[in-house]
Amino acid sequence: MSVQQMRVEITKVYKGERWRLKVLRMTDNQVIAVYHRFVKDGLIKNY
């Protein structure tokens, strides 16, 4: 999964516009870390 795909998936976890903008401003490493945390916590289904 690419970082851009991870970014899209973590954007879906919370519906707010502020969250979406925060995700868009995250570095690639932050996106990867948040994605793996959300998978671990069961907020995102790992494909």
Task: List each model region and its residues.
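Basic helix-extension-helix modules of the SAP/HeH family
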Residues: 1-47
